[in-house]
């Protein structure tokens, strides 16, 4: 799967870097999502846990008819969104 990243116009670096997230973490969550939900304007939200144990939300747009996608952003889940994700995961396991 080819993964492309939104580049921050100010730095020229992937936008995820501004959130302290690496490409390896994003790609791991995309390959092993706990949830993959529809977003707005054709985007999708993959939520999952990295190998290091961090919980991330990755917002991406799949390319039509191709094995590739465009990552808009990714960031660590914290607070109430993290609690809600964990609650949904517990309910799924029952």
Name what the model sees in each region.
Residues 1-94:
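Ribonuclease/tRNase effector modules and their secretory precursors
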